[in-house]
Amino acid sequence: MAKFEIKDGVAIIPKGTREIPNNAFFGCSSLTTVIIPESVTSIGSGAFSDCSSLTSVVIPESIKRIGSFAFSGCSSLTSVIIPKSVKIIGNNAFDGCSSLTSIVVSEGVESIKGRAFFGCSSLTSIFIPKSVTSIGEAVFGACSSLTSIVVAEGNPIYDSRDNCNAIIETATNTLIKGCSSPTTITIPSSVTSIRQFAFSRCSLLTSVFIPKNVTSIGEAAFSGCDSLTSIVVEDDNPIYDSRDNCNAIIETATNTLIQGCSSPTSFTIPSSVTSIGCGAFSGCYSLTNIVIPESVTSIKGHAFYGCSSLEIVHLPAGVSNFEIDSFKDCPNLKAIYAPKNKVDFYKEHFPADMRQLIVEDGSDLPVKA
């Protein structure tokens, strides 16, 4: 096996090396520059993961595959060019590269695996060449600065019809990734499905209009859209509604609220809603007050995850299905009020560090331990 070392911040990869092994430079915080010789054909999983000082990497045209997590967590990396020789960009390959502003995916790349560029929060634009025929789940999820998405004309699998700033799977009319440009998104009327995380952390997005042809919306499709203040579902949509002008997407048949927003700081859930879906209010950072009606019997995981301004919650008596992480990462919660006969139930279902906040309706504010 070739011997690898770092000299003056530069990775020394001997000429003749065919593969950079898994985790070869994992966590090397002193590494700033990587120049890969043209003998290398594969970059292993986690090869440069968590190299937090890495600012520059040159990927030669000999590389055919970039492994899973190869550059994940390289938070100082600002740009990368994926050459035409690369056929596969692995799962989470550049996950969490928060300083990455420019990505060039060259014509010749065929597959971008799940979460390959997840959390690249400085990325502003994406161009998908016509050679890319496979895009995994949440590839560009949580890319909060994204304002431009273009798919090359002639791509046989994907398109960005009507200049919609989105990636759409042509055959199924599924919108798999969208963005705000700068504050609104127009979903083409031909779209029938929105994939999970499609608009995750589009922090500039202020309003969403769901056309009547959209009959499937994936989990957390709009999670972390912290500027979102208006949600409207078109009349006559057979699956979803936004009843009572409630600024939410509700699954009509099950009365499940799957996405809400803060407008601007408080939200009243309609009294007909019986379930609050996974991640329904996740990342609604400005939300300070939530009114949950007595009709609600189920609160799913991450329902209010990361609602960092939320202070007071009143929970109803009828809840029988409650997941422990429903209010995870709500650091400013002062009180969780519950009916007398449900206090013990909620204390059993909340994490230990939050149980002191749960008090009976009408009680004084609890004192944090």
Model-derived segments and spans:
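Structural signature of tandem-repeat unit edges
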Residues: 1-19, 29-42, 52-65, 75-88, ...
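Surface-exposed repetitive/solenoidal architectures
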Residues: 24-26, 282, 350-352
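Short glycine-/acidic-enriched loop or helix-start segments at secondary-structure transitions
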Residues: 324, 347-348
